[in-house]
Amino acid sequence: MPAGARYDAAMTDLSAFWRINPSDADPAETREWLDAFDALVQAEGRERATFLLRKLLDHARARRVPLPPVLNTPYKNSIALADQAPFPGNLELEQRISSIVRWNALAMVVRANRAYPELGGHIASYASAADLFEVGFNHFFRSDDLVYFQPHSAPGVYARAFLEGRLSEEQLSNYRRETEGKGLCSYCHPYLMPEFWQFPTGSMGLGPLSAIYQARFMRYLEHRGIQKTAGRKLWAFVGDGEMDEPESLAGLSLAARDGLDNLIFVVNCNLQRLDGPVRGNGSIVQELEGLFAGAGWNVIKLLWGSDWDPLFARDEDGVLLKRLHETVDGEFQTYAATDGRFNREHFFNKYPELRQIIAHMSDADIDRLHRGGHDPVKIYAAYRAAVEHAGQPTVILAKTKKGYGMGLWGQGKMGTHQQKKLDDAALKEFRDRFALPLSDEDVVQLRFFHPGADSQEIRYLEARRKELGGYLPARIVSSSRLAVPSLQVPPRNQSTTMVFVQLLAQLMKDEKLGARVVPIVADEARTFGMQTLFRQFGIYSALGQLYEPEDHEELLYYREAKDGQILEEGITEAGALSSWLAAATSYSSHGTPMLPFYIYYSIFGFQRVGDLIWAAADSRARGFLVGGTAGRTTLAGEGLQHQDGSSHLAASAVPNCRAYDPCFGYELAAIVHDGARRMLEGQEDVFYYVTVGNENYPHPAMPEDAAEGILRGLYRLRDGSQVQLLGSGAILREVIAAAELLEKDWGIQAAVWSVTSFTELRRDGMRAERARRFGAEGEAWVQRCLHGTQGPVVAASDYVSAVADLIRPYVPGKYVALGTDGFGRSDTRAALRAFFEVDARNIAVAALAALQSPLLPEALRRYGIDPGTRPPWER
């Protein structure tokens, strides 16, 4: 709809509304002003009218006149009837298809819960969204578009795929029964259905945020010349209650700044969340309109069906619009749950003028009045306006009824979200409501209905999808493989962070792979020494660089570019992780494998955005998460909030995340190379979490025969016959120093082992243990490495002791795990390591204690360790 037409419609509606507004002290004068303004528009045009309005606003501000908010429009459809795009489809056939899908979705959930009440499931959400989906499937969702589906509506998507022949009746019968490989997962899970679902949206709020950054990544691919994405759309179906999640709104301004007109949000405004109304005492539609419009989005209200058009046409005094404005959502929910007689009495009969507007209508006529989200004609018009709008992202606020069509058993009811069972009477009423050709026995037995491959419905459905390019959702994995170059790190005194930046630069400079590398930071590039990449590779900006940067005369100046390679996201870990997720799934979303590296303060990863990382695992993401300034004692002065001691424990719980904590540059190089090779050449559905620190120290050359152990998680650095010392990350150097203390001060020979991954060692041990449990042979890598060694084993890391404890079941003999349990502190590294009892002296004392050495008391005195102090986790 043209902006001018929307403006005219809005002004006409507001004019009528203000004429009867009781707060208007002089309606006649108001009418004169409005008539004068109409005459101005008629005589001199909209541009002149806009100019004068701006002048008036400026003048009002100068005179300190309070101004009302101007972000809201009247509570009716944004698209006037005269501007409505004609519906091109066969409405009768599409409604029959929709009714069949509705039945099969309902039958799927109810059947599952009759057999196994603990399975759960949802009926009401899809009941409210069915027409929104169907118009998209029949007319708008192209096969190369991306669609983020509202997760609770998954049964409806399954039911449609059943009609399309892509899912079997057996699969529908096994809804939420997956372990035997014949069922369907609860929500949208690519990990569980890797050929079907593309995007996991089950955790509320992550879908909207991920969708925005995915749409932006599509532009990134286009602007960098990697892939043509122009013409493709991204649709995100979200719930109005879901918009209360902070993540749902977090990316709105980014989408507007970048002009993402490839992005369309459809907010299913059924006015209900799980327990009750979303805004019982207000209006979620008006609230969301203000938020989206204020952020710079194009807003389309889809509130009322075609049967409301004659009522608005009869509303000469604006009384209908007034009544709609004053009705809060709690009342609208009640109207949804009740019949036409109730609606006449409590809504329409409030004003005599309004009563007259519907005087010709029966109670049944009133009961049949549709909300906009249930009218395919109005939905089509809104979608058409959205796809044709340029320069802005669009949000469609579609008003619906939760549990639509479920009658007294569910429509608009407070508990409808939890409704999983319907009795026979309710099922028969549902059948009759949607004119389904089912016998009473079919209904009672909850039989799925398919009209037949040669039926009009199926032929029509197939023709529509053929015209749009194919079926959705469908996850298609690229088969292209990218070669990974060798990586070299010269021995020198530096931090593992600087080693990482060198490795990243080598990959980015590679002739074949370089363009596919996506460096991502959340406003900490300088902290990690990545400013060296600014000038050469550029920072991505959809606008390029419209200013001359302050440091433009410097060699490494801050360079933004439309084809920039670095994604500098600002202070938003959730946004940066969403960009990483888009890049890490590009191989399946766009058929273009990419290699993203997101580096961040390690404490602000799994602890801050762990839910997004879990979604990445579900998405089968491929890429590197790099936890910088890692370790509770290695990041010295920052203190309690910033010092990470737990991320590796969290990472160990993510099945397809391979987590490493290297100490030396050659370890990091081996891990990055092997990870890139596995993901790009081997096409393994894994991602890597690697921690790097900011402590400078010498990095030796790689020992012979260390490669396998580095990747498997454990290898020996130094021989010793009396005690085995294991260390990971920065604390490995304390372990080496402890071995030297033991030899120098106490004459004890200690072997030193580098643990690059306690997580990989644990998983290897679990596999071996499981094999033995089932009667096969199995030996853990830890057991293989330590076989034949002497003495107890002492392990230390810069993380909580539970990390080192991960391998306890597989360590032969006595095992002591040291870690940084407790809250962090601001101090020097030496002081912090002494405080957390992971410095060389404490490790040496732990070894003596494990050996039950009589030298222990003397060692405590010599090293100044007071055994009477409270443990660090209690201080």
Question: Residues of each region from the PLM?
Answer:
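Glycine-rich phosphate/pyrophosphate-binding loops
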Residues: 144-145, 219-228, 585-605, 624, ...
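Short, positively charged and aromatic/hydrophobic N-terminal segments
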Residues: 1, 6-8
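A structural-propensity feature for long, helix-poor, extended segments
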Residues: 236-237, 243, 611-632, 637
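Non-catalytic terminal/interface segments that mediate subunit docking, oligomerization
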Residues: 87-105, 126, 133, 145-146, ...
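Cofactor-binding active-site loop characterized by glycine-rich and histidine/acidic residues
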Residues: 86-101, 105-115, 122-258, 281-282, ...
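Glycine- and acidic
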Residues: 19, 36-39, 86-94, 112-121, ...
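N-terminal amphipathic, basic-rich helices that act as targeting or association modules
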Residues: 12-168, 494-510, 521
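Thiamine diphosphate
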Residues: 14, 177-200, 206, 220-231, ...
